[in-house]
């Protein structure tokens, strides 16, 4: 009887994870709205958990003025302490409205949290839409 119980327990442990057991990517959209009054101004979203090595998703629904530099920052803490720019290539610039992915090294660098940041290097502008730390599909690459 004990041998059967052990064999059953081993068989359960050897089963692959079901979708309910697997780690779910953070693909729920959160809104962002950045306004830059002039060159040198910056805005950022709240920190969110980044669960996979995928790109970050961004859907830009409004843009005015000069397109800012966009970044994906990483941190080990939900407060953003010790944040680091993890954008592949340093930064991206959104060419217009649409759905995009931003390649980054947040998870590869050992960080667990990500945020989207914008920095105006060419003067005033605004950009808004939705984003998620993990990308669930294939979209136009910004980098």
Task: Set out the residue ranges of the language-model regions.
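Short Trp-Ser/Thr-centered turn/loop motifs at beta-strand boundaries
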Residues: 29, 40-50, 89, 128-137
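Acidic, Ser/Thr
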Residues: 61-63
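Edge beta-strands of jelly-roll/beta-sandwich modules across compartments, strongly enriched
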Residues: 68-70, 112, 123-141
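Extended extracellular/luminal ectodomain segments enriched in beta-structured repeat modules
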Residues: 49-57
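N-terminal prepro-regions of secreted/extracellular proteins
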Residues: 1-49
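Beta-sandwich interaction modules
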Residues: 43-49, 89-110
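Beta-strand-rich extracellular modules
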Residues: 119-121
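Short, surface-exposed beta-strand/strand-loop-strand elements in extracellular ectodomains
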Residues: 65-83
């Amino acid at each position: 009887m004990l041998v059967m119980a052990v064999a059953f327990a081993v068989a359960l442990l050897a089963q692959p994870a079901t979708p309910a057991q697997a780690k779910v990517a953070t693909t729920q959209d959160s809104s962002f709205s950045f306004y830059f009054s002039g060159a040198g101004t910056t805005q950022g979203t709240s920190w969110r958990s980044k669960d996979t090595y995928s790109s970050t998703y961004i859907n830009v629904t409004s843009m005015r003025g000069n397109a800012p530099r966009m970044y994906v920052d990483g941190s080990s803490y939900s407060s953003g302490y010790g944040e680091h720019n993890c954008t592949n290539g340093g930064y991206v610039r959104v060419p217009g409205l649409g759905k995009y992915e931003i390649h980054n090294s947040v998870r590869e660098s050992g960080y667990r949290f990500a945020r989207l940041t914008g920095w105006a290097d060419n003067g005033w502008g605004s950009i808004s839409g939705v984003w998620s730390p993990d990308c669930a599909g294939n979209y136009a690459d910004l980098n």
